Amino acid sequence: MSDPKDSILPPLKWLSDQDPPVPTHIKDWLMELGSMTRRFENHCTYIHIKPQRECFITRDKLKEEAAHLPKSTRYWLREVILMGDNQPWLLGRTVIPQETLFEHNEALINLGDVPLGRYLFSIDKLTRDYIHIGRKDTLWARRSRLRLTGKPLLLTELFLAASPLYTTNPI
């Protein structure tokens, strides 16, 4: 991607209470409070990440994501494709204010091909403020604001057609 305004994620429609209810087996996946990476690992033999973009961006590049994060001079952006048995299962976009990266959290800028969940869920001081559910046509998405040692980051995930979210019943 040459233009920093581009994203691997298409525009998503975030659901409200006025939208039809989410099917139970889909909602079970979307409201997962633990590591999505671990959950995916129950449905394949091999998970790997294809990093698409890792760089610092300014607040004006955040668009509507800015409403979910505090003001910062810059933000770490990481966009990846999560693969299960070499099939694309999920597009992930993580936005982290620079202040969240201080101290022990600076490892977040060096994850490379390590899934975000492997890092986040190995830390005792991880909390989740909320999960929003969204869609892009027939694909489901979720957005979570997480906190590491009280400092926020925003994670948006789009579940691709090959994802087990569409083919399995709840575990």
UniProtKB/Swiss-Prot annotation:
Gene Ontology BP terms: pyruvate biosynthetic process; ubiquinone biosynthetic process
Keyword annotations from UniProtKB, A to Z: Cytoplasm, Lyase, Pyruvate, Ubiquinone biosynthesis
Pathway the protein takes part in: Cofactor biosynthesis; ubiquinone biosynthesis
Compartmental location: Cytoplasm
InterPro entries: Chorismate--pyruvate_lyase, Chorismate_lyase_/UTRA_dom_sf
Catalytic activity: chorismate = 4-hydroxybenzoate + pyruvate
Broad class of enzyme this protein falls into: lyase
GO MF terms held by the record: chorismate lyase activity
Residue ranges that the Swiss-Prot or TrEMBL entry lists as coiled coil: none
Annotated binding of substrate, by residue: 36, 78, 116, 157
Pfam families reported in the protein's UniProt record: Chor_lyase
Keyword presence, Cytoplasm: yes
Main location: cytoplasm
GO-annotated cellular components: cytosol
Assigned EC number: 4.1.3.40
SUPFAM superfamilies assigned to the protein according to its UniProt record, in alphabetical order: Chorismate lyase-like
Sequence similarity: Belongs to the UbiC family.
Function: Removes the pyruvyl group from chorismate, with concomitant aromatization of the ring, to provide 4-hydroxybenzoate (4HB) for the ubiquinone pathway.
Protein name: Probable chorismate pyruvate-lyase
